[in-house]
Each structure stands twice: as structure tokens, then as C-alpha cells.
Amino acid sequence: MEHLFESDAYMVRQKVMKILGEEFHIYSNESMQSMIGYSKMAALKLKEDIRVYSDESKSTELLIIKQKGILDFTGGFSIVDGQTGESLGTLRRKGMKSIIRDSWVLMDQKENVVGSLGEESGGLALVRRFIPYLHILFPQQFHLRVNGARGTVKYTQKMNPFVH
């Protein structure tokens, strides 16, 4: 799984024109020369169970992201190493705060907060929730901040009518 975390930049492409479910290809950079991960999610599930594989054959499972509860307002997700079964931590939604703009906390194996993930603009986030298709003109942007680390990681959507 090490190669999944070795890159400084990633490109995640999502197939949009799928009838049921979602499919993602993860590349080590924007040139998309080397695919380092693949995920296919089923539609209409009560609990999310996201599996990231090394490629489309699904022969090597790298990462498991599993929703903890069915009706969990705080949206806890366990993150597990697909090779060893070792817990890597938890990603938990900040309930009420996420109504206006998406906010998450990152926790280690012992449930200690080690970082945060949050939508960049509260104003745009609120407007996006009430005006359909505004996300096409103003895509979501997130910042990941890890406690004790310098700088942040920025996630930006790039809109394309067929993939993003």
C-alpha cells in the first residue's frame, strides 16, 4: 500500500455517466500515466463500504473505508489497511457544523484528533446547497490540516461533463 501514499499530487477521476454506483481511478499525478488505485462503489447501500484496490482486477485490496453506523449524524468511517487489517484511524463528520459546510475530523487508532478536513468557503458551501448546479461554476474545495504539520493539503474538483 506504500505506493498509494508516496505521491505529492493525485488525480482522482470519477466516471459520471454511470447508471448505478460510482467508479474512481486514482493516478499518481495529473498526467495520469500511472494508475495507483481503483474503487467501484455500489449504489443504494445503507452503510458505505469503500474498497480501494491496486487496479481494476481488484486482486489487491489496499484500503477499506467503512461507515460505522447506518443513521449516524456524525458520520464515522473506519479506515483500515487492506493488506494487514490494521486500523489506520477514523474520519468523523462534525454533525451540525457540516449542515452549512462539510467539516470532518481525522482521528488516530485511539480516537485522538490528529487533523481536520473542511470545505473552504462557508458562503459558497451554503449557496451550493440551495441552488442546483451551482457546483458546476463553483466546485467544492477542501483543506486537510494535520496537527503539528506545516501547511495544508488542498482538494479541488475540476468539472468535466463526463468525468471529474
Description of each model-found segment:
Residues 1-164:
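Intrinsically disordered, low-complexity proline/glycine-rich segments
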